[in-house]
Design a protein with these regions (language model features):
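Carboxylate- and glycine-rich phosphate/diphosphate-binding segment that chelates Mg2+/Mn2+
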Residues: 1-38, 151
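Short, solvent-exposed positions on alpha-helices
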Residues: 18-22, 41, 60, 132
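Gly/Pro-rich interdomain helix-loop hinge
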Residues: 53-56, 60-133
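Short, amphipathic C-terminal "tail helix"
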Residues: 130-167
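Predominant activation on well-ordered alpha-helical scaffold segments within soluble catalytic domains
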Residues: 1-9, 25-29, 43, 47, ...
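Intrinsically disordered or highly flexible coil/loop and linker segments, enriched in small
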Residues: 17, 34-40, 102, 121, ...
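Charged/polar positions within long, soluble alpha-helices
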Residues: 9, 33-36, 40, 71, ...
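Glycine-rich phosphate/pyrophosphate-binding beta-alpha loops
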Residues: 29-62, 144-149
Length: 167
């Protein structure tokens, strides 16, 4: 995570930065191994149905959803499962990516939003995904097997809010 947080903006800014590209290759490999072993979550739960319904690149959809899903998970965990170890994992992720040892779990969300903005990743609306589609997307996402790996079950209202925030 630390490697990707450092290298992605550098590789994006200068595609000839071989060290940054090497770090991103390793981060991608490690991320894939982690996902294969730990399971997926709501980001991929949404990405599957969205990819089937719209001509939208999987990676861009995942990036557009990451901060809103993180925010929804943090809110749901704080409200319904405040003792969940997932909150400590989010806090550790925030500390790693921000470089701030005092960072809290909610600090992760603005960091993710800023990264997506700096990388120029389009929001879901860019792909023609709008509020009229949200109920169908949320319904399909709620049934996706990837949702089983989310740290907490999200309500239909929370799923709709994620889509609105990513739109």
């Amino acid at each position: 995570l630390a490697r990707a947080a450092r290298a992605l903006p550098r590789a994006f800014a200068d595609g000839s930065d071989l060290a940054a590209r090497t770090d991103m290759s390793l981060a991608s490999l490690f991320g894939g191994l982690a996902l294969a072993n730990a399971g997926l979550g709501a980001v991929h739960g949404f990405a599957g149905p969205l990819g089937g319904m719209f001509d939208a690149p999987h990676g861009a959809v995942c990036a557009a959803l990451l901060a809103p899903v993180t925010a929804a998970n943090l809110s749901a965990l704080a409200t319904r499962a405040p003792e969940s170890p997932a909150l400590a994992r989010y806090r550790e992720a925030a500390r790693i990516v921000t470089g701030d040892p005092a960072a809290t779990a909610p600090d992760l969300v603005p960091w993710l939003l800023d990264l997506v903005r700096r990388l120029g990743i389009p929001r879901l609306g860019h792909y023609g995904i709008g509020p009229a589609d949200f109920a169908a997307i949320a319904g399909k996402a709620s049934q996706a097997s990837s949702m089983k790996g989310n740290p907490i079950g999200l309500t239909p209202e929370e799923l709709m809010r994620v889509l609105a925030e990513a739109q």
